[in-house]
């Protein structure tokens, strides 16, 4: 029984203690997550560990560390295991799987088939058992009042009933009360134990004394069901969210609270977070007022208490919830009892509010830059704009300064500036190196579906991107865009108005010669594109395309005569689609018009008068596209009817296209090229990509698609094959060269995708010439023996194609990500050109993941895409990760996600 005059005061003790300790954990996490310098290595003990009081608190806290690596249940009374297994069985019974078709290699046992991240730890932090007397007392209180007992699940703690029990209780009916002997207080999900609790209102003092223990299960007991659901859904929760959810266990020697000033103090506090699986301690924890906290002799780690491999120690930490900032003094990062990093002072955030301060530093080694260390500093200038200034220190170059500025406006969009400057680069003949990039995005608040963007890019030289991107994460773009653009769309029109020019970097063309002015792209000053449809006819589809632009390209090196001017292209089409479940037929008529006009400089350069500089041409086009759909239940040849089941779809298709020849040799080519051959291209209306040429095409294209879908909806086979046959030779050329389409056919084209087993995928596509020699072939084999391993092998071979500027290539690609055991894995990726006998790109690394830390060491060797004749860049990188700190994303994972098909789910399985 709790006397009513004690209710509010004991609540203050409980909330003062728990709120203080919870904030301590949250502060440590936020500090390291967003503002701590990146740790290099880590440790387990510190200068305060010899303190007997601290050791006693840690020893008491360790009672809640359960050495049960096989369990997924974060509670000491593990009654939910059977529930978890039962739910897992139910889930498996509801999930359709093709159990009769085995996974390849399922019985080989060459690699671990599962990686259990929980087994990497010796145990886990668990909540103490709930006090059964609390719920019983709540039920009895409700019954005595003739009311049902309140449902405690989801009820805010400040609204939940307060329950207290002890061996002895005294109250003088005025201002003094005392509970002693096995004192227990419960309210909602919060629980406190002590040997004695004293309340003296005359002196304004409340205290909990002797073996104080408190818990805050604000997220509720982590039952087996909740844990299993989180695993099945691969759910991810941010560190800040986890800290805010509670899940705290704490022990202390005593707690003191001043009821008049609100000041509270705890000594020899040890705490653990169940959600974060982290723990720590503070020699003294003081709250002078409701918004300020002072911690002395602080430790924090996510390692097991029995084997603390790393930890952060601080002489003192001051937290201010009003400003959202914290200050740490004399902080040491330790690994295996060895201090490896020290900061005398740093300022960090304790909530989601931004604040100025140092960010995580980076370090790398490469053949271009030697050792590079980057130290960024963040400026929180205003709620809607900020900046980051970084200093880059190189062993082989002078220091470089780079900066980033971000802004967000209410009505004018958002943008970001990035720039850098390196004076007198010793590795680049003493030249200054610099860059500037700008991106802006805007959406209208007054006109729906109207948006805009602006982009600017500049680098000082062609080698800049390659030299200052250690692992080659940025695209080595030949033409850096500078663009301003407006976009609008609705149900009937999709429009784009833009002005665009480029900075073209020095590079080699396909013949190994330096690019000339004639090889550079045209600027569009401006260009207007419209795609529209007319809603007039009920059964007809009437659509149009309009592309108008002024193209400009100055020729200063005499590589060719200048050919700049305006181009107007329009196409109006009418089709009458007839569709049914068994097939379709789509006749279509189109009329195209192309008008070009040279500007004054081009007229002079080409010795043309104004009339000769204007060209206009009309080309009509007619086409019929028809197809059938045949459906049949069962598997191919009945081979899998008893196992996979499913159905088959056979879809033959035939398209006929006719457009007459119109001479266009005097029309300039601003940005048009011939499309690469593939299955879908055979059914398009033109082989020209761009609107400078109107193709004369008289051809028919037969094709067929076959699909097999099993009973679970998995497409086991999807294959297509087609060939375009030319009735008349094509006469339109790109650049006054010989006609392109003068053969009898395009050659055979195919595209197939197969999944013969649940963990094997095979993709093959290719094309033959009209004489049935090989044009190109690409294959990709993906094998995933387990959730955390992946093997890819690919092959590509293509012949030179003068029409499409396709270069010959014979290359092998391969990648592998696989665990050696529960802690170690190998990552590798490569691309080999066996015509040149040259490894174009290779990466190999090892990755280690432990209970509370991980690291990776990897190297990459790759060639500059802009100049394959250059020497390859070689880089070695090392990463250290501390569990529970940081986002988990790294340069290595970003690189592999781009290079390795299917890497991201494998990465999630390894981490989770």
UniProtKB/Swiss-Prot annotation:
Keywords linked to the UniProt accession: Cell outer membrane, Membrane, Signal
Entry-linked Gene3D superfamilies: Lipopolysaccharide (LPS) transport protein A like domain (2.60.450.10)
Native organism taxonomy: Bacteria, Pseudomonadati, Pseudomonadota, Gammaproteobacteria, Moraxellales
Signal sequence interval, chain numbering: 1-27
Domain of life: Bacteria
GO biological process, alphabetically ordered: Gram-negative-bacterium-type cell outer membrane assembly; lipopolysaccharide transport
Chain's role: Together with LptE, is involved in the assembly of lipopolysaccharide (LPS) at the surface of the outer membrane.
HAMAP family: LPS_assembly_LptD (MF_01411)
Organism of this sequence: Psychrobacter arcticus (strain DSM 17307 / VKM B-2377 / 273-4)
Protein localization: Cell outer membrane
InterPro entries associated with the record: LipoPS_assembly_LptD, LptD, LptD_C
GO cellular component terms listed in the entry, alphabetical order: cell outer membrane; transporter complex
Protein name: LPS-assembly protein LptD
Assembly information from the UniProt record: Component of the lipopolysaccharide transport and assembly complex. Interacts with LptE and LptA.
Family: Belongs to the LptD family.
